[in-house]
Amino acid sequence: MENNRNFPARQFHSLTFFAGLCIGITPVAQALAAEGQANADDTLVVEASTPSLYAPQQSADPKFSRPVADTTRTMTVISEQVIKDQGATNLTDALKNVPGVGAFFAGENGNSTTGDAIYMRGADTSNSIYIDGIRDIGSVSRDTFNTEQVEVIKGPSGTDYGRSAPTGSINMISKQPRNDSGIDASASIGSAWFRRGTLDVNQVIGDTTAVRLNVMGEKTHDAGRDKVKNERYGVAPSVVFGLGTANRLYLNYLHVTQHNTPDGGIPTIGLPGYSAPSAGTAALNHSGKVDTHNFYGTDSDYDDSTTDTATMRFEHDINDNTTIRNTTRWSRVKQDYLMTAIMGGASNITQPTSDVNSWTWSRTANTKDVSNKILTNQTNLTSTFYTGAIGHDLSTGVEFTRETQTNYGVNPVTLPAVNIYHPDSSIHPGGLTRNGANANGQTDTFAIYAFDTLQITRDFELNGGIRLDNYHTEYDSATACGGSGRGAITCPAGVAKGSPVTTVDTAKSGNLVNWKAGALYHLTENGNVYINYAVSQQPPGGNNFALAQSGSGNSANRTDFKPQKANTSEIGTKWQVLDKRLLLTAALFRTDIENEVEQNDDGTYSQYGKKRVEGYEISVAGNITPAWQMIGGYTQQKATIKNGKDVAQDGSSSLPYTPEHAFTLWSQYQATDDISVGAGARYIGSMHKGSDGAVGTPAFTEGYWVADAKLGYRVNRNLDFQLNVYNLFDTDYVASINKSGYRYHPGEPRTFLLTANMHF
């Protein structure tokens, strides 16, 4: 469709600030755009600018049909080039390019998080991770060896993907075969005997067929932690038939195996804000921090996982303006782990003498044996057309999805206490066997959606979307009877101790209507202002498939609870400057989350909570000059409880694991044809942690700065080297902390990574 432009109530209390921000950024952006135009006018031949490898111009998800610069949402796209330059080998590392997003939460007091435990704008986003627009379930670490780009969308994503976190989603785009042949390989070695190799082979066969193979292997020790090791292997073959024609068939497979040592963290003794949990343990107030290398697990701890994903996608171009796609995917993620962690509190400390070096702390064994499966078929149609003088950019579709999860019950493991300052990991508990007390969850979803962008005039656009999800969740769980402790049940007459007894068998069905609407006005050819409003819902058990009977007061997943609802307002501006090589954005946002489930003082749950996250965010991505690239951003966010029980340790209304200030910037410069230099810095402000009645633990973590650097050298067209240095100034900081505050994960110390990249 041809056009002069590339068309394929309550006010915020900080609106005055944002207006000033927009006024400030507008003349700067206009001046930069004018400078680029002036430079073009001074030449006799005007060449089209080369798109920046640091700022992909388009989302790979067909639901987002407009360019990133014209999308009325806060969206960060982390390109493959950024991932390579930074040596980011997993999703959590790649997300360091997005301000305020990270793995800040280390789990509850009795268990720990694993994998990509991401928080974004005050909410757990670990269950809103997608691969090619399809939900990827499982608490595992996701490698980037088969990733083309990572798309981070802030604000409710229910209209885009169905039930999801109220504050954002993450979409990893897989590599696909392309219309050129070549081989890229890398070999890396680094601190703590880090070893990694990757292979990316693309081969064209005939005129319309191409195959691609990505392979990865990695073994490493954690540079800052004793005993913690990680090992993973992956293979991802793919083939496309009909490349360059109107009919294309893509076949993809992904297999990843991981053998890791889980890390339960170390005691927070000695951190700012720590105090002994009782008068009898007051010596801990002066005994100093534990060695951050200490490992409080056992030599038997393990975290094994296997991911298998098979995808078939067929695309047909009905005409030049209309394409229909059908995607079928089957995926299974199996995870089995034993993770040992300390148990906080004065009652768990044993004091054989007055010397704190002899004191011990109780340990708990966290176990998981789970299998997640998803089977989905999705059909999408995109089309650009006119109705009269109004242009349309339409994306519509239907989705059928079945997600299942089985948590296998295992027998409990008893562990001896561990010395607080001199832990001994040479323990082999054994006895980790299944007991038949399983939990099974299944959710079937049918969804239909439609999005449209209307070009009203040359400069003015309206957009909107609606999605209807019809879902049905079934859940049953059993408990081994005759046990002790929380959740224990007595054995019915005639049932042997340890036998599985069904305790929950229930179901929940319903409809979710999510929608969004926005407007965009182009102030110039390269700059716009926009507004957007979105509504997103998530039903009870929407994250973990777990349900409880209606009226059962001791569960947050009761079937009589209403869906959680998030309403987000956003106003922003986006500018493409320097001949459209650099994208500048600024946005003011507010998200109100309703129907939050709160735990009462007696341990029961009620649904009366309300949260609010509001603030602003600015970002930059692209090229300042052909040789100078950067990506970064800053956010200021205030996350509070508007109604409900305060969840912060200090009794404030602040939401935990949400830094009020966060900054990130990475910049790379091509100094000569053969030498490149890069540097980056990120800041995570102080964060409140959760509260569960723990005594003496830190109420918040302190803010910190971390700097990274890179040096690249090209030997010839077939070989180049890069040296990455992480945490350049060896900053000591708290990377994550658990809810009670008894345990934390220290940030990784200064490390080095040397990589040889080969191209053929």
Curated annotation (Swiss-Prot):
Main location per the UniProt record: membrane
Stored Pfam families: Plug, TonB_dep_Rec_b-barrel
Classification via InterPro entries: Plug_dom, Plug_dom_sf, TonB-dep_rcpt-like, TonB-dep_rcpt_b-brl, TonB_box_CS, TonB_rcpt_b-brl_sf, TonB_sidphr_rcpt
Superkingdom in the source lineage: Bacteria
An example Gene Ontology molecular-function term: siderophore uptake transmembrane transporter activity
Residue span(s) of domain TBDR plug: 67-175
Keyword Membrane: yes
Locus of motif TonB C-terminal box: 743-760
Cellular location(s): Cell outer membrane
Membrane topology designation: Multi-pass membrane protein
A Gene Ontology cellular-component term: cell outer membrane
Keyword line: Cell outer membrane, Ion transport, Iron, Iron transport, Membrane, Receptor, Signal, TonB box, Transmembrane, Transmembrane beta strand, Transport
Similarity annotation: Belongs to the TonB-dependent receptor family.
Biological function: Involved in the active transport across the outer membrane of iron complexed with catecholate siderophores such as dihydroxybenzoylserine and dihydroxybenzoate. It derives its energy for transport by interacting with the trans-periplasmic membrane protein TonB. Can also transport catechol-substituted cephalosporins. Receptor for microcins M, H47 and E492.
Protein name, UniProt field: Catecholate siderophore receptor Fiu
Designated gene of the protein: fiu
